[in-house]
A protein has these predicted regions:
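Short acidic donor-binding/metal-coordinating loop in glycosyltransferase active sites
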Residues: 23, 80-81
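Canonical Radical SAM [4Fe-4S] cluster-binding loop centered on the CxxxCxxC motif
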Residues: 7-57
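Membrane-proximal basic amphipathic "stem/tether" segments
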Residues: 1-7
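Conserved Rossmann-like nucleotide-binding pocket used by diverse enzymes
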Residues: 19, 77-79
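Radical SAM/AdoMet-radical enzyme domain recognition
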Residues: 61-77, 86-148
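Conserved non-cysteine loop/helix-boundary elements of the Radical SAM core domain that shape
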Residues: 39-55, 81-87, 137-148
Length: 148
């Protein structure tokens, strides 16, 4: 238990800003327990409401610009939906990495369902500088491992 408590001891941490950004509601899955589907008014397969949408790239660049102007180090988390199917994923990662790198303590992470597989991630910009959070979806367990 002591190791667990030490892991979350915040006495050494400088002030920072945590940003959890739903960059898209697009996803390869439609999990029955997905908070985002409910939050973005998913109604049915035929009437998706705001589900499976993405803001314009110009609007997203404005968000990234605002993040880059922070006077505090940023911990920026890209989530959704599934960020890796963003149509400009490589550019998104590059611009976000540039924005958080203004401060040495800045961090960028991607929350992913992991469906795309290791080769996808390893081929992307800043792979060695990103953190990945993987959420496994048991409803779609049969789709993992094919690298789609």
């Amino acid at each position: 238990m002591k190791d667990f408590v030490n892991q979350y001891d915040t006495g050494h941490i400088t002030d920072r800003l945590y940003v959890h950004w739903d960059v898209s509601t697009q996803c390869q899955f439609k999990c029955t327990y997905c908070y985002a589907m409910k939050e973005y008014n998913w109604e049915s397969n035929d009437a998706p409401g705001d589900w499976n949408k993405i803001d314009s790239w110009d609007r997203q660049k404005l968000v990234i610009g605002a993040i880059s102007r922070s006077s505090l180090p940023i911990f920026l988390g890209l989530q959704g939906g599934e960020p890796t199917i963003h149509p400009k994923y490589d550019m998104l990662i590059s611009k976000c990495h540039e924005a958080i790198s203004k401060h040495e303590e800045g961090r960028l992470y991607v929350t992913t369902n992991g469906l795309r597989g290791p080769a996808f991630f390893e081929s992307k910009p800043y792979y060695d500088k990103l953190m990945f959070l993987w959420s496994f979806h048991t409803e779609y367990a049969d789709r993992y491992g094919n690298g789609s």
